[in-house]
């Protein structure tokens, strides 16, 4: 077993092809999908450092990283840290089969060596501890601190029953549910159905302004400057206009 890697400073054709192909066989959330990442990249000026990790020439992981300057400090972080509720690597679904902790840490050390001349701090925030049925090595292998906890929706009944319960809720609750659901790869189809229920609630389209106001409140609670919300709004409006969500 041999690990190798390649670093992309932009989402060029090769990078996009690898990423697009990977989405069919890899585990990731909505925030690591290529169409969302591309919107983020278009609206920020951070330096991209997308790392593709190979095991015997087979892609097993994509690390969507960027270097952002905070005042005079260059920070390595996940792409979209300010906007995404979940910031994770993108791992192949058979990652466990190809994972060797020692090899992974060695290759990570080499990657960091390449970044070092322009890097002052590594800050990986909003990570999932477990991705599908395997542990996130960036949480498992390094010392981490819990800043806060969030709880995702757990569907304990058939979707039709759940949908009926949504009809009984007011529009505000429906928007909150929809906003949460669209974030997750596994719940894409469900999120579209929730979107239909919102339209049935006397609304012609998804109320982006309403969602943004709620997101701004989240950003405020995280002490993130309000100026970020305007970029967030632009990103999601573009996605909705293009019918990607």
Predicted regions and their residues:
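A conserved beta-strand-loop-helix scaffold within acyl/acetyltransferase catalytic domains
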Residues: 2-56, 60-76, 126-150, 158, ...
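A gly/proline- and charged-residue-enriched helix-loop-helix capping module
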Residues: 81-119
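Short beta-strand-to-loop capping motifs
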Residues: 91-94, 153-157
